[in-house]
Amino acid sequence: MGLWDVDKIEYVGRAKGPKEDFAFHYYDADKVVAGKKMKDWLRFGVAWWHTFNQELVDPFGTGTAHRPYYKYTDPMDQALAKVDYAFELFQKLGVEYFCFHDRDIAPEGDTLRETNANLDKVVDKIEENMKSTGVKLLWNTSSLFTNPRFVSGAATSPFADIYAYAGGQLKKSLEIGKRLGAENYVFWGGREGYENLWNTEMKRETDHIAKFFHMCADYAKEIGFEAQFLIEPKPKEPTLHQYDFDAATAIEFLRNHDLTDVFKLNLEGNHANLAGHTYQHEIRVARESGFLGSLDANQGDKLIGWDMDEFPTDLYETVAVMWEVLQAGSIGPHGGLNFDAKPRRTSFYEEDLFRSHIAGMDAYAAGLLVADKMNQDGFIQNLQAERYSSYDSGIGKDIDEGNVTLADLEAYSLDKPQSELIAATKSDHLESVKATINNYIIDALAEVE
């Protein structure tokens, strides 16, 4: 059985019925969908922080999680033990990627030098396990938000010593990424923002973080670290207002600071909701702007206004996400679906780590199957083509091709009666569109054996 009292998770389809717990009903890793294996479309990753470090605390209570490595009370002993548990979990789930923050994998020392020594010991063991299992690092990142020194930010801190420390910490993190062959490197600015504008020099802070990003890019080039750099937008929490508010804001920041050749975006479902957007909206913005890099797979709760990091189970959302991915051709150049998600506080058994990942993996596999069926039928493409058909000829075509002026538009419209203008509009039949998507979900998944 191994370290975890769970067998390897296998694909069973729908044959054993909906109550089969420890099996995939829709995720068939080697099944070819739209010209690629399912595993190559989805490129699932496990998040070290939520999976192995999360004790399932909440603001009103202590942790409830049962984890086998809690028997190790020394922080370094536990950190090293987690590596063995982690790689067995990856293999039993059939997941080929993982992600971590530097401070997830090893305890901090009193100085950066001591902390780096701790990291080296754990990275040695991670590297050995990567070589023996073939599991790869989707991305790594640096925790520049948990320690109290980052109370007012890291690369936007008003305290130069903290900025300098952040740079030193980031240097080591990039070296680890290079050593472990990370395909991406993520920057999430949890403390990069402000609590109050009265005491904040916003331009100075954003200029500082832009300089920081340029230094990181320069050092990555110096050491030959070729990972795709990614910014992960989030509007707030823990900071009142974060500078990487959403996809559009982050893209504008990159354009303003000459960073568009270096960065793309890592987008998270629950972060999109906090910014007042759907996950599909954020992916669409990034995709159509050429900045789609990778995805963090989770969801929020419609009734709760903070970052819940639930495992994704909403099929309507996973269909929308995978439809966008199909249009893009991939989740970015080297991206994947990292489960930045944790079991609920009441799901505290060891086995719930497996149950929750199975739920998320099946939800996205189902989303891919439905999106592929919609794509094959051209349902969305035909819907959009019909809606914008007035731009295929006449004045519409001239507008699309940039061949008109305001004077031309005035001349075209001056004598058109209201009745003719109203007649030019058409109903969207939105309720039928949504019903048809529901039908695709039901029908496409019914075809799975």
From Swiss-Prot:
SUPFAM superfamilies per UniProt: Xylose isomerase-like (SSF51658)
Q: Which InterPro entries does this one have?
A: Xyl_isomerase-like_sf, Xyl_isomerase-like_TIM-brl, Xylose_isom_bac, Xylose_isomerase
The record describes how the cofactor is bound as: Binds 2 magnesium ions per subunit.
GO terms (BP aspect): D-xylose metabolic process
Asked if the keyword Cytoplasm belongs to this entry, the reply reads: yes
- Which EC class does it fall in? isomerase
One GO MF term, please? Answer: xylose isomerase activity
The record's active-site residues are 101, 104
According to the record's subunit comment, the protein's assembly and interactions are: Homotetramer.
Q: What's the protein name?
A: Xylose isomerase
